[in-house]
Design a protein with these regions (language model features):
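Walker A/P-loop
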Residues: 28-47, 57-60
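Conserved P-loop NTPase motor "coupling/switch" region that bridges the ATPase
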Residues: 129-133, 148-161
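Conserved helix/coil segment N-terminal to the catalytic DExD/H
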Residues: 39, 46, 87-130, 138-144, ...
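Conserved pre-motif I regulatory segment
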Residues: 1-36
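Conserved Walker A/P-loop ATP-binding site and its immediately adjacent core
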Residues: 54-76, 81, 85-87, 91, ...
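Loop/turn-to-beta-strand initiation segments
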Residues: 30, 54-57, 79, 102-107, ...
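Active-site phosphate/pyrophosphate- and oxyanion-stabilizing loops and adjacent acidic/basic residues
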Residues: 3, 46, 154
């Protein structure tokens, strides 16, 4: 684990609590992480994604954040993508094919994507090894009325045990 931490992230050691969190995720425990900004939360799901077979679905509320993380991961040699708005230029079926055959480790989507039954059906065909909700504090800070799609996340546990 430390070898992968050094190779991809450039750290020789974990920050406080990161190793225990990663171990919890690797043990297939549901894990809630609350750390301050800059505390290293993202690494807590990114590292297990590298250590496990398959890919991790990351649910993120902001397109710009998804794009930044995908760019950062790809620059580090970690294949990542995010599902863009369904359009003629980027049809969802093509994006799903990219996910299915592209050997990605991290795939990102907005909570609104989870409201689409076709998206969920196609997501079931992917070798998911975990689901992370990034920026989860936004749920309580922004309120359930601002992004009601966040409520759909609760059903993922049954669909992807």
């Amino acid at each position: 684990m430390l070898e992968i931490l050094k190779k991809y992230f450039g750290y020789n050691t974990f920050r406080p609590q990161q190793e225990a969190i990663v171990q919890s995720i690797m043990s297939k425990q549901d894990t809630f992480v609350l750390m301050p900004t800059g505390g290293g939360k993202s690494l807590c799901y990114q590292l297990p994604a590298l250590l496990k077979e398959g890919m991790t679905l990351v649910i993120s509320p902001l397109i710009s954040l998804m794009q930044d993380q995908v760019n950062q991961m790809n620059a580090m040699g970690i294949k990542s993508m995010f599902f863009q708005s369904n359009s003629q230029k980027f049809p969802i079926n093509q994006q799903m094919d990219n996910a299915r055959f592209g050997k990605f480790k991290l795939i990102y989507c907005s909570p609104e994507r989870l409201l689409n039954a076709d998206f969920i059906s196609q997501l079931k065909l992917l070798p998911l090894n975990g689901i992370a909700v990034d920026e989860a504090h936004c749920i309580s800070e922004w309120g359930h009325d601002f992004r009601p799609a966040f409520k759909s996340i609760k059903g993922l546990k049954e669909l992807f045990p």
